[in-house]
Amino acid sequence: REAADGELSTDTASDPRKMRLSRAEYKQIVRWTEQQRPTRQCMKVLKDKFPNHSQSTLLSIFSLEYQKRTKRTISRHHAPDVIESYYQRYCIIAVSIASYSLCFFSHLYHCVDLSPALMARLILDRFLLDLEGGMPSKTILNSMLKEPSLIPDQILAKHIYQCTINDCCYGPLVDCIKHAIGQEHEVLLCDKLKERNLSFLDENQLRAMGYDKTPDIILEVPVAVEGHIVHWIESKASFGDDHSHRTYLNEQFWSYWNRFGPGLVIYWYGFIGELDCQRDRGILLKDCFPTDIVTLCHAAQQPE
């Protein structure tokens, strides 16, 4: 099953399309995304361009790449004179718009290469500055972004709403979807372990025991996967690219290895195949729940 356009699907285990990519395949997708904007319409085009790849994989790659692009350029959009120019352009156009057409916002965020949700945040922040006579609180700003009906200007509220639902990388809707998808994959992992009658402790149980930094799963009895011992499993509902995997290694995976021993990372939406190079050091990568799990107690009963 594919998710709705621009959203991630949790049915990754049964998706036959490629999720483990060579670096060359990954770079081909990245090159094509460089000139794209983070809208659901662009995701439809991306899906048509690479039909052999999971839509969830493509969206995850696109989102990671666009976020890198945004981090490099976001500071220039936050300059006071730039925000003022965006807002004045909006005010001039909004006065002359009789309908709730999205033509202005669509034109603006395409021209300046800023995601719809981030542009909406800048415009709303500036609008509230006039309305309240000072800098609005983040609480008020965030509540209006999540619930645009709270915005007193109905035309602006409609624009904010449309920007939020049209953005596939940023905004409260995307944040909510990503959080839900992450939790669903953790539940999926637990269900798979229970199907195999494997005893484990989940993250909540481990924290209750006093652990502060833990993987999603600690196996009470280690298993072997493709000949490698696994003590813990980490679930990642994203694509594993060079930058994110390097960050996870430094901030999470090696600390898990130091404390709990070798483990398994599941990138449910795929990863660059060349990154699976730490197996001998104790970190195994997969893009689905492994089918060849061997429990150590079972292995001990095998004849020599």
Residue ranges of predicted features:
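A structural preference for short, hydrophobic beta-strand core positions in alpha/beta folds
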Residues: D202-E203, V265, L285
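Catalytic cores of nucleic-acid endonucleases
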Residues: V230-H231, S235-D280
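Domain-level recognition of nuclease-like catalytic cores that cleave nucleotide substrates
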Residues: Y269-E304
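Beta-rich nucleic-acid/ligand-interaction surfaces
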Residues: R207-D216
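Nuclease-adjacent, charged terminal/linker segments that flank catalytic cores
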Residues: R1-K158
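Acidic-basic catalytic patches of nuclease active cores, encompassing PD-(D/E)XK
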Residues: K158-A208
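Conserved catalytic cores of phosphodiester-cleaving nucleases, focusing on short active-site segments
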Residues: L189, L193, P215-D242
